[in-house]
Structures are given as C-alpha cells and as structure tokens.
C-alpha cells in the first residue's frame, strides 16, 4: 500500500436508540447514532406486522372494473 493516501481507520461507537452499543472501526471518524439495529428491528425480533391490503385491492377492482366483463 502507498503511504499517506489512505484515510485514518479509527475505533468508533455505534449507539442504537434501543440502547444497544456496538464498538467497531470506521473511516467516518465520529460516533454514529442509529434508529434501529439488529436487536430492535421488527424483522429480526419476530414482531413484524403484516399489512392487509385485501380491502384496498377489492376497492380498486370495484372502482375500475369494466361493467359487464367478469373473469
């Protein structure tokens, strides 16, 4: 590697809003605050909600269907 052309690689702390603290290294040079992490994200915790769009689809089909044509 060439000397003097690479950014400084510093140790930083990444803090999530849930309180999880992760120590890592980065060229950012400053600590980072996150909104969600792997410990509190709904997909990873199993608390994911499924949004039911069945009513919207039926309303769309009812509104834009051609009268007289039925599949």
UniProtKB/Swiss-Prot annotation:
The keyword Transferase does not apply. Keywords: Metal-binding, Ribonucleoprotein, Ribosomal protein, RNA-binding, rRNA-binding, Zinc. GO terms for molecular function: metal ion binding; rRNA binding; structural constituent of ribosome. Zn(2+) binds at residues 16, 18, 37, 40. Coiled coil: none annotated. One of its GO terms (cellular component) is ribosome. It comes from the Bacteria. GO terms for biological process: translation. InterPro entries: Ribosomal_bL28/bL31-like_sf, Ribosomal_bL31, Ribosomal_bL31_A, Ribosomal_bL31_sf. Disulfide bonds: none annotated. Its cofactor is Zn(2+). Binds 1 zinc ion per subunit. Binds the 23S rRNA. Part of the 50S ribosomal subunit. Belongs to the bacterial ribosomal protein bL31 family. Type A subfamily. This is Large ribosomal subunit protein bL31. It comes from Mannheimia succiniciproducens (strain KCTC 0769BP / MBEL55E).
